[in-house]
Design a protein with these regions (language model features):
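Non-catalytic regulatory/interaction regions at protein termini and inter-domain linkers
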Residues: 2-5, 9-30, 34, 38-48, ...
């Protein structure tokens, strides 16, 4: 049986990105392809499998995201793996776009180019959004290493201000730190989240902080509770099941 091979341009059209991005993914091995002479080809079956792994509807009850305040919120999300985390971020950003908001993505352990790829595979036109300044992606670890907690917090504030200057009313942003993102010390992370909560409550920002907890036991349980106390609500998400809890931070 003959396999259908797609050109780079065809794949770029399907994923709503540019051919240069597809070439970059192919060279990095992030998208499987075959070389025919000097030209790349991607098997349709391979592309469909990749899309089926990442472009699923992750929240069965879409009204769950409607619980997030459309203009001011600071939400913690608890996930089990990177695939769930990217799924949740993608749906969060789609909800923000549907409400006419500007998007902000802060990277801690994630590489910005990986974020672009993963969100593109989940149906977001990343290059188009970045080209219009409707989305900005920033390396927050670099900002933290340079300026401590004030670096990432200042980025959140600056992007919120820029959002208003561009004519938007609200910025929807996602951070997704790791438990050891802030210099390898959990207390530093708690201090950062507490300070971010103080700043976000004064800005037209809907912020979500997705975390990965592969297991919740012993120290992880106390860390989870500690972080929850610095967010106004919490989403628990795992493989298509999600629960939203309203929280009153301590």
């Amino acid at each position: 049986m003959n396999e259908e091979l797609l050109t780079v341009d065809e794949v770029a059209d399907i994923l709503r990105t540019t051919p240069n991005t597809i070439y970059r993914w192919l060279r990095a091995g992030k998208l499987p392809g075959v070389k025919i002479g000097k030209e790349w080809r991607i098997r349709r079956e391979t592309l469909e499998l990749k899309l089926s792994e990442t472009n699923t509807v992750i929240i069965k009850d879409q009204s769950l995201l409607d619980n997030i305040h459309p203009q001011h919120d600071h939400v913690m999300a608890v996930t089990r793996n990177t695939n769930n985390l990217y799924n949740l971020e993608a749906e969060f950003f789609k909800k923000g776009l549907s409400r006419g908001s500007r998007l902000f993505k802060g990277c801690w352990w994630q590489h910005p180019d990986d974020v672009r790829q993963e969100l593109s595979l989940r149906g977001l036109p990343i290059e188009e959004l970045e080209g219009k300044n409707s989305l900005t992606i920033v390396d927050l670890t670099h900002q933290y290493n340079r300026s401590g907690k004030n670096g990432p917090i200042q980025i959140w504030s600056d992007e919120a201000r820029k959002t208003l200057e561009l004519g938007y009313k609200t910025m929807w942003g996602s951070g997704s730190p790791h438990l050891l993102s802030c210099g390898g010390h959990f207390p530093n992370l708690v201090d950062f989240e507490s300070s971010l909560e103080d700043v976000i409550r004064k800005l037209p920002v809907v912020g979500i902080c997705p975390y990965i907890f592969e297991t919740i036991k012993d120290d992880c349980f106390s860390q989870l509770i500690n972080l929850m106390n610095h967010h106004r609500s919490v989403i628990f998400y795992n493989d298509g099941l999600a629960t939203y809890l309203k929280n009153e931070p301590a």
